[in-house]
Amino acid sequence: MEIPADLNLRKDVPLGDFTTWKVGGAADFFAEPDSSDHLEALVHWGRGQQLPMRFIGAGSNLLISDEGLAGLVICSRRLQGSQLDPTTGIIEAQAGEPLPTLARRAAKAGLSGLEWSVGIPGTVGGAVVMNAGAQGGCIAESLIDATVLDPSSGQTRRMSCNELDYDYRHSALQSEALVVLSARFRLQAGVDPSELSARTSSNLHKRTSTQPYQLPSCGSVFRNPEPQKAGRLIEGLGLKGHRIGGAEVSTLHANFIVNTGNAQAADMDALIRHVQAVVKQAHGLQLHPEVMRLGCFANSQAAAA
């Protein structure tokens, strides 16, 4: 298989280095494009080689199996940058732009609407796909549209917020094989930057004081079964501190599973399934993960049921 040197492809790259849980096997081929043109060239090559392709951002909502991923894995975290108009409140950001960076830049420009996201360890692309949210806010509230790439054809197009069919931690992109390249947001202009700075600082303090930032995690593991909170249900059943291998239900926030230092992806998967089973037995509720599994897991169908 001929690999063009200008694609900067690497072989057998451990993917745990590119997820916030720090677990997962290797990718057959791996690349971090630094421009949209580079990404499109990678997709063109992968399509020509008939390789399965996976796309990741900051890796904060992913559980990659210990066996790794076949084919080509493309990480968008180097596709950074944003442009904003302080008059109209419109801001456009590349898929790999860290969400906290975008939130702080908007706040400094007097643009309100992303303060809730300052503590989320993800990228714009991942946030658009997952309809990320916190502190009562979410991506869908301010998104105008997203520019997406269809890997099967190499074509790009814009999808409006309505087309993305947003719901709680859901978008149409979770079931469509499309890749976010950039996104546009409409924020409230003309707000005092010092007021916005105070809001972002307050939101960040709330997250860092109640969530386990000192250990690798993926963020919230389960969606909240409205009107209840997943973390409260899990804590109420005495599962804080429960371990399987190196995976542990956080003693600080029960909707977080942390890597205590030597966890495998299989440990994370098993603990997720254990928590689901205990909650189901006690309350008759099925907790649905926010985290997306990639690769092969034992009993994966049971876990997703």
Swiss-Prot record:
One GO term describing the cellular component: cytosol
Keywords from the UniProt entry: Cell cycle, Cell division, Cell shape, Cell wall biogenesis/degradation, Cytoplasm, FAD, Flavoprotein, NADP, Oxidoreductase, Peptidoglycan synthesis
Matching PROSITE patterns: FAD_PCMH (PS51387)
Annotated catalytic residues: R169, S220, E290
Predominant location: cytoplasm
EC number: 1.3.1.98
Known pathway: Cell wall biogenesis; peptidoglycan biosynthesis
GO biological process, one term: peptidoglycan biosynthetic process
Limits of the FAD-binding PCMH-type domain: 22-190
One annotated GO molecular function: FAD binding
InterPro entries assigned: FAD-bd_PCMH, FAD-bd_PCMH-like_sf, FAD-bd_PCMH_sub1, FAD-bd_PCMH_sub2, MurB, MurB_C, MurB_C_sf, Oxid_FAD_bind_N
Highest taxon, organism lineage: Bacteria
Cofactor(s), by name: FAD
Record bears the keyword Cell division: yes
PANTHER family attached to this UniProt entry: UDP-N-ACETYLENOLPYRUVOYLGLUCOSAMINE REDUCTASE
Protein family per UniProt: Belongs to the MurB family.
Alphabetized NCBIfam families for the sequence: murB, PRK13905.1
Protein name as it appears in the record: UDP-N-acetylenolpyruvoylglucosamine reductase
Species for this entry: Synechococcus sp. (strain RCC307)
Name of the encoding gene: murB
